[in-house]
Amino acid sequence: MGCATSAEDKAAAERSKAIDRNLRIDGEKAAREVKLLLLGAGESGKSTIVKQMKIIHEEGYSEEDCKQYKPVVYSNTIQSMIAIIRAMGSLKVDFGDGDRTDDARQLFALAGQAEEGELSPELAAVMKRLWADGGVQGCFSRSREYQLNDSASYYLNALDRLAAPGYIPTQQDVLRTRVKTTGIVETHFTFKDLHFKMFDVGGQRSERKKWIHCFEGVTAIIFCVALSAYDLVLAEDEEMNRMHESMKLFDSICNNKWFTETSIILFLNKKDLFEEKITKSPLTICFPEYTGSNTYEEAAAYIQMQFEDLNKRKDQKEIYTHFTCATDTNNIQFVFDAVTDVIIKNNLKDCGLF
């Protein structure tokens, strides 16, 4: 009888040890799993960050992948030109050269007939002539007064290359493409022995109700803000300033009960566009109380302060802020390295090892 009991005890002890071992392995695995939520208003650069993760931490975009983006590059380019020409009508801007009126008609006719993924030599030539026109350039410089893709000038300045026979989009062309994110896009990659799951959530207002179930167990939130949106209004609401909308959203995320334990990383993005714009368009458009100079350093620091001041739990919660240019791979690589170090440090703290 005694032998049977001790054999059972031994088996139970082995089972208990195995359970403990599995729990420890699961615990270590969980500690190495990082869930990142990418949040921010529409067109703040979230999807570009995801593309950069594919370039930096995965195999990047193969030639075949890049070819798939050709229709998007062409569509973005054509739609940008159409948006500028339409705005000339509403803003009452005349062409520098009267002959361009005929080109504008041609643009609409040819764009309507264009095959997806094609840019005919005729359409490219029409767009090139229009883009070189003084009136079109004047209207482009007023793009804050209407909705225009950030990449408009990047693509329109490259029309010869885009229209060349055998054109294949470059990684930079791919990074610059704009497609509205609907739903949730999930990306997985490994970096510094951590397994990342990154969730990109549609930023437009209509998408926000889909976020909530992603919130639980999130390690960190990367909140993207388009610095250059300080003088723009929303695509969904012509009355609402984009920067104010971003601040409202950041306030609701930063002080949300779901995120008491979550690291919040703030990406003040599109710093390159902001640096270009701030000398021509004063920050007082967005912040009438601002009395500083319209230099990049001072204006950017003021915006950073506006966001960080929204944090109601400064004593317990730190906001980790970075100035970023999502289309610059080196910049994002450097910043993401720093972000990962913060995540590792906070993970160690949670385990009582720091």
From Swiss-Prot:
One GO CC term on file: cytoplasm
Single biological process term from Gene Ontology: adenylate cyclase-modulating G protein-coupled receptor signaling pathway
Region G4 motif: start-end pairs: 265-272
Region spans: G3 motif: 196-205
Domain of life: Eukaryota
Lipidation (N-myristoyl glycine): 2
Residue span of region G2 motif: 173-181
Record-listed GTP binding positions: 40-47, 175-181, 200-204, 269-272, 326
Matches recorded under Pfam families: G-alpha
G1 motif: region residues: 35-48
Matching SUPFAM superfamilies: P-loop containing nucleoside triphosphate hydrolases, Transducin (alpha subunit), insertion domain
Covalent lipid adducts (S-palmitoyl cysteine), residues: 3
Alphabetical list of PANTHER family matching this protein: G PROTEIN ALPHA I SUBUNIT, GTP-BINDING PROTEIN ALPHA SUBUNIT
Free-text function comment from the UniProt entry: Guanine nucleotide-binding proteins (G proteins) are involved as modulators or transducers in various transmembrane signaling systems. This G protein is involved in 1-methyladenine-induced oocyte maturation.
Family of the protein in this entry: Belongs to the G-alpha family. G(i/o/t/z) subfamily.
Name of this chain's protein: Guanine nucleotide-binding protein G(i) subunit alpha
Provenance organism: Patiria pectinifera
